[in-house]
Amino acid sequence: MGKILVLSAVTDDCYTKNSAYILKKYLADVQAGLDKYAGLIGADKRAYLLPEGSDTYGIEGDIYYGISNLTGDNPYSVAQNMEGKLPRPMIQDDFIATYKGDEVCVLTPEAARWIAVGSEVKAITVNVKGNSEVKEAKIGTPLSEVVDASGAKAVLVGGLKGEYVKPESLASMTVGTDFNSSSLTVIGADECIVDTLAKHMDQAWVNSCGKCVLCREGTLQYKTMVEDIIAGKAKMTDIDLIKDVGGLIKLGAYCPYGQNMPRPLLSAIELFSGEIEDHIKRKKCPANICYKKAAPYVILPDLCTGCTDCVDECDEDAILSKKGFIHIIDQDMCEQCGACVDACDEDAIVQVEGKMPRLPKKLVRVGKF
């Protein structure tokens, strides 16, 4: 059986642009490293796997185009990608991935360059306020010297497999050769951490290959739970569930992506428990970003008969009431489950978008408001 050495440039996530940067700036070094490694392992064939729609960067050789994914350095995933299939990894010590009868071996652009020139410098994508820039830093450099995050709320270190940290923590963290140094994304003080997590978990779900149940279902559940926090439908018990599920995923997920997928969400919960609790308990978003899609439930005073039927259906005790008095929904307590709507025969409970109707601020007798 022959060997084919594939340079896989499809490993970057949505926070990272390192592969394209390295191919564009250091193609000669990359090819030198590829040639050297091919000789070391006895690979008689070489190929390049680039993202769909990518530039060729002046590469001469066998070029394949595939789906960018977080398992793009796994030989089996690469072989599947080259065949035009959904790339999914195979994690098994004695398994040999093949493409057209040849054993598949994989290098990333950065790994190939390191073989040629040494691994003293790391490419890092820095994302600030929607702008991305790839910087280079020596291994061991404090992350605080790579990006100025002073005054920021948080920094996502390592993208979809990374973790959220406070800006002051960057001084004690250094540039390494692993994925934790692939990108630094600054979360501004005016941004909402829950809204940020919702976007993050949506990407985590999109990037799950779906091969193992824990990652496939875990990313979907996480995505749904964070969206529920934004919509005002979550409960504090959901946070405990997120933590419990995270432990299971880390232990049982199939590949390194799945095992690390819970890290960003769990780290954010640890750092921003107060802000997240404000969203859940008080329906309060400090950045005034969330709840715009979640129209609040109100009780129309001209239709309410003071029957208390809705009160019996509210598990959160969020309805202020007294028999014969116009009821009032406590917006800080309401979980927006909608159970009260079904209980009201008068159709007095509605969701309001835009301008709120005139409502009583305290209990008033029916017909007296």
Model-derived segments and spans:
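Iron-sulfur cluster-binding cysteine motifs and their immediate structural context
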Residues: 213-220, 259-260, 266, 309-326, ...
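Short glycine/threonine-rich loop-to-helix capping motif typified by GTGT followed
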Residues: 54-59, 165-173, 226-227, 268-271, ...
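Hydrophobic alpha-helical positions that pack around
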Residues: 3-7, 13-33, 40-143, 148-151
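C-terminal accessory/binding modules appended to enzymatic or scaffolding proteins
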Residues: 121-133, 286-331, 335, 339
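Short loop-to-beta-strand transition segments
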Residues: 149-160
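Ferredoxin-type iron-sulfur electron-transfer modules in oxidoreductases and energy-metabolism complexes
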Residues: 179-296, 301, 321-331
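Short, glycine-/Ser/Thr-/acidic-enriched flexible segments
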Residues: 11-12, 54, 142, 160-163, ...
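Eukaryotic mixed-charge, acidic/polar low-complexity intrinsically disordered regions
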Residues: 164-186
